[in-house]
Amino acid sequence: MRLPSIATLFHPLQSFSIRGGIHPETHKHLTSECEIETMPMPALIRLPLQQHIGAEAEPIVKRDDLVLKGQLIAKARGPLSANIHAPTSGRVIAVGHFVAPHASGLPVPTITIRPDGEDKWGPHLPRLRPENAAPEEIAAQVAAAGIVGMGGATFPSAVKLNLRAKYDLTTLIINGAECEPYLTCDDRLMRERAEEIADGIGIMARALGVKQVFVAIESNKPQAIEAMTRYNRALGYTFKIHVVPTQYPMGSEKHLVKMITGQETPARALTADLGVVVHNIATAHAVHLAVRYGEPLIARTVTVSGHGIRRPANLRVLIGTPVSEIIAHCGGFTEEPDRLLLGGPMMGMPIQNPRVPVVKGTNGILALTAAETPEAKTMPCIRCGRCVQGCPVGLTPFELNARIHAGDLEGAAKVGLMDCLACGCCSYNCPANLPLVQSFQFAKGKLSERQSRKHQQEETKRLAAARKAREEAIAEAKKQMMLKRKAEMAAKKKAEEAAAAAAMPPPATATAIQGEATP
């Protein structure tokens, strides 16, 4: 079938302005023309039980169990959690702890599988026909497949798909902005799998019951724009391809909503309050595979880049594959990297141990050289305001930083500390090279710690008060019981005395006695 040209399908849409933002060097040329290739089977697969926002999954396998590809090995613990499946067939060699793919490097509960090389599938999830499926069925299938937000947030996707029960939803926005420097995995996915992505978008739109769908793509991805424009229809929906400016952090959920709809999401509110739900491009692709083919989320596309990587690439990688094996597949390091990151350079997570695994939210592995991360001497703040100009939330980072360093964390919270996205725009703009984001993250952690401690203290007081109230109630109940028993005993005694008195013969009268005495 001959597809219509992009000129007949694509029309620029109205965009609304957003505040702040920066334009860092993108470095996307390193991998933008690298087609997605399949990463070979790793020697070991390590699956942390918490690859998502919410409660960690509960393991349902044990050491030495044989598992099949796609088999459920850890089940969601409650609605805000996610299932985890075996990415290939093999043997479970450990259900214990391993280093987290996190800057802390702390051990976390992990299932380790040694692949058997057969890559043998177990039973798939039941396939659905989304044209006839109820919204609840689609959401349940997405939950069963363990799908989470694959742009990095890792929020369980089924929870979002069920929002129609609580909110009046009108709009679905698919986030294909991919604004982080270096990363091109979503770009390549749109260029190579546009038809499958479109189907996933249609499935999600049907589940949400929205009236309109936008696909947001940055202007520096013309081939992706063309591909998605050609496949802009599915399940009765026609998607509007919205080309957004190449600007960081354009991929931020609330900024996309403002750019496309003109609506400002209030602080601590949800975009669903405005009738809008945002999902990632890769999430749409995972939904397509889960609903149409019954495949759980066991693999994802990852960009491997940076001048420290000998052969930058876009790879289709099994979840749980060690970063070290991926780097080796890409030819190893060109030199010892100055920074090794999971994710992008702005919001990515530095790691010390390359043996950590790729998880569901891992969209990039970056090995940055010293030339890419130049160290600059920090100087005192000159209150130039460049951090304010860059902040997409409209905060005053220099004031936040001053309050934090003065120990006034509550004061920093009052001027918006908890609204910080940790996007890094302020640090990027700062001529004094101050580590603003690190300062804000530290302060947010301290505040959260204080609030947690305060909550624990209040909970302890509440429990103590409740215990005291229970003890007083028990004591009062005992007192009342004793009083009641005493009253009952007194009444019983009185009744017995009355009965005894009634049973005695009446005393003889004087007249009667005299009469008895007369001869």
Curated annotation (Swiss-Prot):
Cellular component GO terms, alphabetical: plasma membrane; plasma membrane-derived chromatophore membrane
Domain 4Fe-4S ferredoxin-type: 372-401, 411-440
Keywords for this protein: 4Fe-4S, Electron transport, Iron, Iron-sulfur, Membrane, Metal-binding, Nitrogen fixation, Repeat, Translocase, Transport
Gene (UniProt): rnfC
Function: Part of a membrane-bound complex that couples electron transfer with translocation of ions across the membrane. Required for nitrogen fixation. Involved in electron transfer to nitrogenase.
Reported cofactor(s): [4Fe-4S] cluster
Keyword Repeat recorded: yes
Subunit: The complex is composed of six subunits: RnfA, RnfB, RnfC, RnfD, RnfE and RnfG.
Metal-binding in keyword set: yes
Membrane association type: Peripheral membrane protein
Taxonomic superkingdom: Bacteria
Subcellular location: Cellular chromatophore membrane
The protein, known as: Ion-translocating oxidoreductase complex subunit C
Binding-site list for [4Fe-4S] cluster 2: C391, C420, C423, C426
EC number: 7.-.-.-
Species of provenance: Rhodobacter capsulatus
Region called Disordered, residue ranges: 494-519
